[in-house]
Structure formats: structure tokens, C-alpha cells
């Protein structure tokens, strides 16, 4: 099952800008159907652009797809970097209609951008992780 987030004011339509959204409904979606996993409520957006983006991003980090009414360039780049595929839809698009499409498509090959996100989220084999950490230490980049 994939987790898919919807920026919604009322739970029925995608109608919120990512940076100002105070509610994300997260659904689990698979070929058998979908169900509401969780409604995530956030505080009013901060005036600080970084804080605003980070708090919204933290609310959806476990999701593969993020449906929003609008999103700024900086926020979109951070969402993509977090391995989440942002989908900008027309404001007022029905959450149910989108879920119907996601369920229908769940048994098929995902679109290339979603496939890329899923591949990026796959756990790396231990040897690859180890090789990267050793290389970082040799360069002096150890975390």
C-alpha cells in the first residue's frame, strides 16, 4: 500500500496551497482499494518561509505522492528532494475522484516520475551504504 497525501481544507477536495495548508489527509492506496490512514492537522503557517515549508514537509514525509492545489518553486524542490512526487491539481478537485484513479492505477506500472520516487525510497543494500559511508570518511565528510 502506498501513502498518498491530499492538501485539503474540508476532506472532500484538494483546495490548499502547500505552504499555507493546515490539513493533510493521508490515505493508504492499493489495488484492492483505499482508506483514510490519518488526518494531519498543522498550526497556522509561520511567516518564516523555511519554517513554513519544513513543518508542512515533515507532515508528509512518509507519503509517496502529494496532491496540492498549488506549490511554490522552493517548496516543490524540497518535496522532490524528500522523495515525494508533488501533483498539482485544479483547486476543488475531488479527493474521491483522485482516489478512484489511484486505486485503478495501483495494479499497473506507475508513471515514470512515481516509479523514480519509489525506486529512490527502496532500502539500499548494506554493502552500498557501507561503501558510501567509507568513501565519505575518506573525503572527510563523515556525518
Curated annotation (Swiss-Prot):
Keyword terms: Nitrogen fixation
Keyword Cytoplasm: no
UniProt key word 4Fe-4S: no
Pfam families documented for this protein: Nitro_FeMo-Co
One Gene Ontology biological process: nitrogen fixation
Gene Ontology MF: a single term: metal cluster binding
Domain of life, per lineage: Bacteria
CDD domains, per database record: NifX
UniProt-listed NCBIfam families: nifX
Record family assignment: Belongs to the NifX/NifY family.
Protein name: Protein NifX
Gene: nifX
Amino acid at each position: 500500500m502506498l501513502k498518498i497525501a491530499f492538501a485539503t481544507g474540508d476532506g472532500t477536495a484538494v483546495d490548499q496551497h502547500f505552504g499555507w495548508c493546515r490539513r493533510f489527509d493521508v490515505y493508504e492506496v492499493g489495488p484492492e482499494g483505499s482508506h483514510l490512514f490519518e488526518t494531519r492537522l498543522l498550526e497556522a503557517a509561520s511567516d518564516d518561509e523555511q519554517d513554513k515549508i519544513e513543518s508542512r514537509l515533515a507532515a508528509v514525509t512518509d507519503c509517496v505522492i502529494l496532491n496540492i492545489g498549488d506549490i511554490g518553486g522552493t517548496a516543490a524542490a524540497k518535496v522532490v528532494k524528500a522523495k515525494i512526487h508533488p501533483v498539482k491539481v485544479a483547486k476543488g478537485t475531488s479527493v474521491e475522484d483522485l482516489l478512484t484513479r489511484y486505486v485503478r492505477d495501483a495494479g499497473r506500472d506507475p508513471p515514470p516520475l512515481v516509479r523514480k520516487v519509489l525506486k529512490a525510497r527502496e532500502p539500499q543494500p548494506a554493502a552500498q551504504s557501507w561503501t558510501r559511508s567509507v568513501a565519505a570518511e575518506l573525503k572527510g565528510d563523515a556525518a
